[in-house]
Amino acid sequence: TIMGLFLKDIILKGKTALVTGATKGIGRGTAIALAQAGANIIAVGRNQTELDSLQKIIKKLKVKYHSFNCDVNDFELMKKYISKIKKLDVLVNNAGTNIPEPFLNVKKSSVETILNVNTKAVFNVAQLCANQIIKLNKKGGSIINISSIFGIVAGQNRTVYSMSKFGVEGLTKGMALDLAKYNIRVNSVCPNIVLTPRTKKYFANRNYNRYVKENTPLNKTVTISDVATSIAFLASDASSMITGTSIIIDGGWTAR
């Protein structure tokens, strides 16, 4: 299963979670993991075929499923959708992108694309969902922003990506302070490179496993399940005293 060892300890029954970027990779795996833990799922993505495919999986888990076919950069459409939600406890702010380029050759269009998706849209969706949680739920909620180890350290050919993810880290801490009085916890997860269809394509002409393992003390790569399990923990009441922090999922990469 997507979850792993601690599924039995993470109970999300009765909670509703909105997951952006839910059609593939970490977002898809997280939506399934949260559903396995009992959460009802609202999936946001741009590929209707994949949203329908996810629905078939989620429905088998006996929880509710709704989806919005929407680009997170479309603020007005996201606002329209989120304002219609009748129950919301958890946001997984996952949508993201990267265009690896050396600093001296970074295109202006790349900067705009990366910052719009990775930072501006994360801010906008978080603000919309936080207001909706406050409106609907006196008990508060949990917001998990998907960051990266490159929001903690730099990476070659990832200058703009790092800039965007460092922004997410600052956003997470600021939100945690401002939303604490509403009992809304805000945290981030910072995974190392996860092997997804997108990263497989990027590393097609490189020895991915060798590269990652040689730089990871635990000598293994991060999986979608590793990330989804941590997100489920932060979404659950088991993490009720955790806010304003980051869970680094990197096998020791950043400890060097």
Residue ranges and their predicted role:
Residues 16, 23-25:
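Conserved glycine-rich cofactor-binding loop
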Residues 102-103, 107-115, 212:
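Substrate-binding pocket helix/loop in short-chain dehydrogenase/reductase
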Residues 180-185, 242-244:
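Short, small/polar-rich loop/turn modules that mediate ligand/substrate recognition or access, typified
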Residues 126, 164, 172:
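Active-site helix of classical SDR
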Residues 4-9, 153, 232, 243-256:
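Short C-terminal tail/terminal secondary-structure segment
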Residues 148:
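Residue(s) in the substrate-gating loop at a strand-loop-helix junction
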Residues 39-53:
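Conserved glycine-rich Rossmann-like NAD(P)H-binding loop of the short-chain dehydrogenase/reductase
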